[in-house]
Structures are given as structure tokens and as C-alpha cells.
From Swiss-Prot:
Protein's UniProt keywords contain Translocase: no
Protein name per its UniProtKB record: GMP synthase [glutamine-hydrolyzing]
Alphabetical UniProt keywords: ATP-binding, Glutamine amidotransferase, GMP biosynthesis, Ligase, Nucleotide-binding, Purine biosynthesis
Protein origin, superkingdom: Bacteria
Any one cellular-component term (Gene Ontology): cytosol
EC identifiers of the protein: 6.3.5.2
Pfam family, one: GMP_synt_C
Boundaries of every GMPS ATP-PPase domain copy: 209-398
Active-site residues annotated for this sequence: C95, H182, E184
Enzymatic class: ligase
Pathway: Purine metabolism; GMP biosynthesis; GMP from XMP (L-Gln route): step 1/1
NCBIfam families registered for this protein in UniProt: guaA_Cterm, guaA_Nterm, PRK00074.1
Length: 523
């Protein structure tokens, strides 16, 4: 099949209520979108340069200006178009977004005499719609070096801290509001209530965004895009690909072929579990045993980015070969989600690591177009969508698993021996956590086989075996995460079982690093 340039199909949801989030480069932009959607209102993130185009096409009921790393008085600092303030659309500016609003409307922004970072006690004017029914004093999350020293005409100060006289500003008549703190961060006690007030009290939202409405529109959009074409999907059995498979099966039925590429890098028994879950469904299910092929390509490779690239490219090669066998294939479907796109780097941000679904793909593939119906959804939304689709709980709520599989949970070169060791150790870790009464406090947990060997003693013999790292985190959005305080008795039991039951490991360590500064995965 002749290679054709990649052409991405963008799915536009026909949702009646939308909030435009104007992106000024802040680190919490996706979190703002998540918070808005949690309140049943759809949101889109758009650069400031495209804000007016978006407004003309989508008619949002409200606008949120994000934070950002710049100072508004600097040359080339990003600013909203001034026309945006004359459209009679409610606007909420967050941190830099508040400063940008003040600057554009004639206020004054300058460096703060005292910078504010972290939790800060704040006093609120609860008489304004934005702060209705919240506590008049509560802690918020501050992160700023500049402040609004003079308010624009028509605005009043709506919140104060010990060091900031204008911690929030309000123009009730024009429905323009600014907050110097980050309401979207969990550390802001009344943050979600403030966002809710903006959506419902200020913008007049009714709340029509949910997975039921998304599913209905997504099916229509996929059908309109695909028509009578054939769709090929890589089915890993993870949450994302499983939900996507169910959605596409609902949309195009027999025109969907799901290829399960068993690259030999999966968790214990997972390959057979995936096949058992999907082989009897109406979709066309094909399992490809490609373990030796992948391990051959990965032989001698230790660099994690090279591993990801190799696995991504080999996945596509397998798809091309399978496509030749099954005939004409028009569309390649991918379970790309928001976090994949964010962590693979965008303009103006550093690349953290390439995701298998994004940076690991070659530039050209032998399909007409790429479709990514889940690209705008957060992980928890995808789980909710899976429930809406009727998928079994063990598929919807299974542990997140990266596309490259255990290849990025083994430090250094990948070998069959290391894979066998890690599978057994990881299975014990997951099993013990799932049987302990702490599962509700865990978002993701797994084992990592390090490349470090240490000296140990077992019986009368000296050992020189691998060190295993255990990881468990709690997160609501996977943009940030805290390590979980696992009870000592659980850690003790896990350590004892692994050392005694898994040959090749003689030392266990527990990862107590949050995200940031670390990522959840080790590679």
C-alpha cells in the first residue's frame, strides 16, 4: 500500500454551552478545562491569537483567561484582543489572566512588593456573584510576582490578602472578573465553588456536558467522517483503547477491525485477558503475536526515548502489514487523550517525554487519515464514557498502562529474563494493594525493574541481583500526583513475597517522589 501523508481528522462536538479558555501559557491550563467540565460545562483551550475566530464560530457563554509565565508590561507579552471585552460575554481572568484584563482596560500592573507563593489566607467580598455562598475567609493558592496596583475604571476590589490589596477585582455590570489566585488548584479551598459560581451565576450555564451527550455527538461525527470506510484500531486492552474500540464499534460496527498487537511487553496474563474480553464481540478482532519482532528491534537499546520511538514505529509497521492482509483500510484510529498531547510538548513548552501515541509515530503511515475521538477527554472522562458504553468494570477501571508497556518500566536493555522478573513482581505488588483496604486511595501503582544490582544474602549464599522499585500515586487528573503513604505492614508483606517468590530480585525500594518534579512513570 502506498504511503500517504498523515491527515488528522478533528472532531467538533456540537455542544450548546461552551466555555472558551484563552491560553496564555500557564501550567494549569488543562486543569482549568478539567474543572469546568467537572461542573458539566464543555470547555475548549485556544491560543489568544485565535480567540476571536473561536468566538465567532462557537459563541461561548463565557471566557476564562489562564495564568502564564509572562509579565504584561514586557515587550511581546501575550494579551487578549481588546475587542473581546466589548462582546458582552462574561470573562474570568486567573492570575496572569487578571493582570492582562486590568492592563488592557486601563489599570496598572507592576511588580509586587512582596511575592506570594503557596497557600494564602484571603478575605472575600461574598456580595458579588462570583463569591456567592463561599466562606468570607479561606486559603487560596497564590503564585505571582506581579499585582494589579490600580484597578481599571468600573472595577472594585473583591478580595484581599495581607500583602495584596487587589486579590480579586469585579465589574458586575459588564460581568468581568479577575482573581489573582489559582481557583483551579485543589489547594484553593473554595476554588471549585468559585468556578461554579462563574459558570452558573455569572454565565448562566445550564450544564449540558456529560459523557452521554459526548457519546451521541462523537458517534455522529465518526459516522460522518468515516461513512463507508474501513477503520483499523490498535487495541491494547488498556482503558483508552478499550473505550475507543467500544465507541467505534457502536459507530461503524463491522467496518471496524481491532488489531491487538501483543508486543510481549504486557503485564502478567494481560494478553490472554484482552483476547478473552474482545474476541466474541461484533467487531473484527485480530491478535498478532509480535514479541520476538519487538524484542529484536529493542535489543541493545537502553535510552527511553529510543525505546518509545522504536515501539511506535514498529506498531505502525505491524498495522501496515495487517492492513495489506485485510484489504483497503481508510482510517487509523488512536486512543490519544489530553495528557498524551500535553506531555509530548506544545509550542513554547519543553518536551517532557514522547508518548507512544504522539511522538513515537513516524511521519507517514499507509492510511488515508487519522481519527482520534478521545483526544479532548481527560482520563476520568474516558472511564465515565466507558461506563456509559456498558464496558465491564474490570476494563474501565483497570490500571493505566503506557503504550510502550513494560519497556519503560525496565531500566536499560529489555530482555526476556527481565520481562519475566518484572511481570511476577508487578503482579504481587498489584495483588497485595488490591486486597488491602487502601485501593480507593490509589490512582496508579506498578513496579519498576531498575538496572542496579546489589549484594544480598539468602540463606548461606551471597546474591547479586536486581533492585525493584515500587510506585503508587494518588491524582485526580494525572497532570500532577502525590505519592501514597502505604502502610508499613503492606510494604513488609509485599517485600517478603517478592524476595521469596521472584528469582532475580534481592532488594525493594519505594518511590516517594511526587509529580512534579518527577513524572509518574520512570521513563
Amino acid at each position: 500500500m502506498k504511503k500517504k501523508p498523515l491527515s488528522a481528522k478533528i472532531v467538533f462536538m456540537k455542544i450548546t454551552e461552551k466555555i472558551l479558555i484563552v491560553d496564555f501559557g500557564g501550567q494549569y491550563n488543562q486543569l482549568i478545562a478539567r474543572r469546568v467540565r467537572d461542573l458539566n460545562v464543555y470547555s475548549d483551550i485556544v491560543p489568544a491569537s485565535k480567540a476571536l475566530d473561536y468566538i465567532r464560530e462557537n459563541k461561548p457563554i463565557g471566557i476564562i483567561f489562564t495564568g502564564g509565565p509572562n509579565s504584561v508590561y514586557e515587550e511581546k507579552a501575550p494579551l487578549p484582543p481588546k475587542e473581546i471585552f466589548n462582546l458582552n460575554i462574561p470573562i474570568l481572568g486567573i492570575c496572569y489572566g487578571m493582570q492582562a484584563m486590568a492592563h488592557c482596560l486601563g489599570g496598572k500592573v507592576e511588580k509586587s512588593l512582596k511575592r506570594e507563593f503557596g497557600k494564602t489566607l484571603t478575605k472575600f467580598d461574598t456580595g458579588i456573584p462570583l463569591f456567592k455562598n463561599i466562606k468570607d475567609k479561606s486559603s487560596v493558592w497564590m503564585s505571582h510576582v506581579d499585582c494589579v496596583s490600580r484597578l481599571p475604571e468600573g472595577f472594585v476590589s473583591a478580595a484581599q490578602t495581607a500583602n495584596t490589596k487587589n486579590a480579586a477585582m469585579a465589574n458586575k455590570e459588564k460581568k468581568l472578573y479577575g482573581i489573582q489566585f489559582h481557583a483551579e488548584v485543589e489547594h484553593s479551598e473554595e476554588g471549585q465553588n468559585i468556578i461554579k459560581n462563574f459558570l452558573y451565576n455569572v454565565c448562566g450555564a445550564k450544564g449540558d456536558w456529560n459523557m452521554k451527550s459526548f457519546l451521541a455527538e462523537a458517534i455522529k461525527d465518526v459516522q460522518n467522517t468515516v461513512k463507508d470506510g474501513k477503520v483499523l484500531l490498535a487495541l491494547s486492552g488498556g482503558v483508552d483503547s478499550s473505550v475507543l474500540a467500544a465507541l467505534l464499534n457502536r459507530a461503524v460496527g463491522k467496518n471496524l477491525t481491532c488489531i491487538f498487537v501483543d508486543h510481549g511487553l504486557m503485564r502478567k496474563n494481560e494478553g490472554d485477558e484482552v483476547e478473552a474480553a474482545f474476541r466474541d464481540t461484533p467487531m473484527n478482532f485480530i491478535r498478532v503475536n509480535a514479541e520476538s519482532r519487538f524484542l529484536g528491534k529493542l535489543k541493545g537499546v537502553s535510552d527511553p526515548e529510543k525505546k518509545r520511538k522504536i515501539i511506535g514505529e514498529e506498531f505502525i509497521r505491524v498495522f501496515e502489514e495487517e492492513a495489506e492482509k485485510i484489504g483497503t483500510v481508510d482510517f487509523l484510529a488512536q486512543g490519544t487523550i489530553y495528557a498524551d498531547v500535553v506531555e509530548s510538548g506544545t509550542k513554547g513548552s519543553a518536551v517532557i517525554k514522547s508518548h507512544h501515541n504522539v511522538g513515537g509515530l513516524p511521519d507517514h503511515i499507509s492510511f488515508k487519515s487519522l481519527i482520534e475521538p478521545l483526544k479532548t477527554l481527560f482520563k476520568d472522562e474516558i472511564r465515565n464514557l466507558g461506563t456509559e458504553l456498558g464496558l465491564p468494570d474490570y476494563l474501565v477501571h483497570r490500571q493505566p498502562f503506557p503504550g510502550p508497556g513494560l519497556a519503560i518500566r525496565i531500566m536499560g536493555e529489555i530482555t526476556e529474563e527481565k520481562l519475566d522478573i518484572l511481570r511476577e513482581a508487578d503482579a504481587i505488588w498489584r495483588s497485595e494493594l488490591e486486597h488491602a483496604d487502601i485501593k480507593k486511595d490509589l490512582s496508579q501503582y506498578f513496579a519498576v525493574l531498575t538496572s542496579t544490582k546489589t549484594v544480598g544474602v539468602m540463606g548461606d549464599f551471597r546474591t547479586y541481583d536486581y533492585t525493584l522499585a515500587l510506585r503508587a500515586v494518588k491524582t485526580s487528573d494525572f497532570m500532577s500526583a502525590d505519592w501514597v503513604r502505604i502502610p508499613y505492614e503492606v510494604l513488609d508483606k509485599v517485600s517478603s513475597r517478592i524476595i521469596n517468590e521472584v528469582k532475580g530480585i534481592n532488594r525493594i525500594v519505594y518511590d516517594i517522589t511526587s509529580k512534579p518534579p518527577a513524572t509518574i512513570e520512570w521513563e
